[in-house]
């Protein structure tokens, strides 16, 4: 009887955690079993064969495809002047394992994962590959339960703002994008200049400007001249995009 009571407490505690997650993200699953499945590792299923559990591997497969599509759509619309090669490179950086782990950790997904005892003892709860898989499985479950619009809304709260904030700017060659745009339009010559160097030698900060035919398009700041020029080019692209919309 006490074992049953213990199991009941564990179940209720687990259910409360999943309800807390739903409240946190502002989404209520119609089928909560799908949500729990997204966090169920194969090691847990192997140790609980008497009760029917399904692991998250199929949901992970689906979520991977949904992420590829949604991120591709977002980048296609967000960066109209970016080449196919650059879009592919940026998407790869966004959906790679280290990035997905960061998104999973931001939502404390590791605390919700159902693991077998062996996997738990070997640190599975914080294993990067496992957390990335759980994030993909969650996206798969969300898609099945709520549809694409809700997936896009969720990513609009968690993933897309990071893109807008420049979290992946290290793989984005803004100077090349700007050069291609100017060449395509035949609008003139780009010139970069370092306006200012600030700070001590070990912690320099550079301010760069990019101009088109002598007219300033953007100013950027960076820890190196190259980084400052990239940020200036990024600002220039945003200026030109805003002008296109008017």
From Swiss-Prot:
Active site, UniProt feature: 64, 136
Annotated positions binding Mg(2+): 60, 133, 136
Residues that span the membrane, as ranges: none
GO molecular function (one): metal ion binding
Disulfide pattern: none
InterPro entries in the cross-refs: dsRBD_dom (IPR014720), RNase_III (IPR011907), RNase_III_dom (IPR000999), RNase_III_sf (IPR036389)
Subunit note: Homodimer.
PANTHER family, per the entry: RIBONUCLEASE 3, RIBONUCLEASE III
Name the record gives this protein: Ribonuclease 3
Primary gene name: rnc
